[in-house]
Amino acid sequence: MDGDALFPRVDAVADSFTAEYRKGALTDSAQLGRLRDRLKTLEDSARQYAVSNELDRILTENGAQNLNASTGNDATNYFFSLPSNRAKLWFVLESDRIRNPVLREFYSEREVVLEERRLRVETQPFGMLLEEYLAAAFRAHPYGRPVVGVASEIQTVDRQAAQEYFKRFYGPNNAVVAIVGDIDVDSMKAWATRYFADIPTGEPHRPVVTQEPPQRGERRIDVEYDANPQVLIGYHVPSARHPDAQALAVLSQILTGGRTSRLFQRLVIRDRVATTIASFQFPGSLYPRLFTFQGVPIAPHTTQEIETAVYEELARLTREPPTDEELQRVRNQIEASAVQRLASSFGVAFQLSNSEALWYDWTQTFRDQAAQSRVTAADVQRVARAYFDRGNRTVATLVRPPKPATGGTN
C-alpha cells in the first residue's frame, strides 16, 4: 500500500475507509470465479479468535457506519466510516483479516451466494437478459462471464480453494486504501507500516491478455421470460483509457442524459413509447467494453420502436453535430456530478481509491472530468461514425415465451 498520497479533510468528523483490491471477476479462473463473492461476505469470520459476526460487532461498538462491500469485473471494494478517534482500529482489523483468514462460515455463505444469484439473475428479468446479452457480445474476453458466477461453479468450490484464492490475491501489494476525514497523515503512514509491512505479498495483478476478436456481423438473441419486454443494444467500444472514451461519454449524455436528452425527449416525453431509455459503457473499464442502450417500452408499443429511434438518432449524429446548447448542458451535468461525488468523505474516498486501483494514478479521475469538458461537436460526430455500425452491434430482447397450444376433443 502506498502512503504517499494522503491528504487530510478536516471538515469531516468521521473517517471514511475504502480498501480496493486489484482483482475482480477478470482475475478469476472458471473454477474459482465466484470465490471473491463469498470472501467479501465472510469478513465477520476471518479472524482466528473471532466468534460469529465478531468483526461487525467490534466495528459497530466503535461507531462504524455504512459497512459494505462490492465486487465487479475489475476490482473488489470494502468500505465503512469510523469516528476519527477510532481510525487505528481499521488498520488492526484489516491487517488481521488478511493475515489470518479463517473462513468458518464458508458453506453457509456459499448458499447465500447461490441465493443471491437466484434473486439477481435467475428470477430477475433484467438480470437474466443482461447475462445472456454479455455472453452473446463477448465470445472470448472474460467480460462475457457473469460476475456472480454460474450455479455449478458456486456449488462445487470448497473451503480449501477459497483459502488458496485468498492467499493468492489478498495481499497489501494488491490493495489501495483511501482514508478521508480528520486524519493525521503521519499516524496513518506509521500504522500502515506497523500493521501491514510484515504481511506476505499476494500474487500481483496481471492484465488479461485475451482480446475479443472483431465482431463480423450483427448478433441477435431473444431471451424468453414471462415479463414485460425490454431490449439491450450494444456496440463494442474501447476501454476507459482510450482517447475516444470521453467523447463516447459525452455522446451518451446527449442521447440519454436527463429529461432534455434527445432519446428521452423523443421516446418518453413526445411519443410516449418507453418508460425507460438509458445508455452506459460497461461491464468494466480496464478493457474494451460495450456502449449499451437499455429500453423498456410501454404497451402496446414494442422494443422494435425503441430500436428504430436509437438507430435514427445515432445516424442523425453522424450527419448533424450536437448544438452548442447540448454540449453546454453536458458540461453542466459533468460538473454537477463531480461536485456530488465529492460532497461526502465516502464519495471522495471511493473516487480516489477506484482511480488509483484501476489506473495507478489517483488524479486520473479528475483529468477524465476535464477531458470530457473539452469534447467538441466534431469529436462526438467522429465517434458516432467510428463505432455505431450494424456489424458491431449485439441486440438482446426479453420476450414472453409462446403460449402452449391448447388441445380439445371432438
Walk through the language-model features, giving the residues of each.
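Non-catalytic beta-strand/loop surface segments
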Residues: G3-N85, L119-P172, D198-H242, Q253-T302, ...
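Solvent-exposed, non-transmembrane alpha-helical starts
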Residues: K88-W90, Y107, T123, A190, ...
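A common structural junction motif
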Residues: D96-L103, Y195-E203, Y311-P322
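Short beta-strands and strand-coil junctions in structured, solvent-facing domains, enriched
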Residues: N100, V185-D186, P238-H242, P300-T303, ...
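Extracytoplasmic/secreted cell-surface and envelope-processing proteins
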Residues: V185-K189, P243, T303-E305, R393, ...
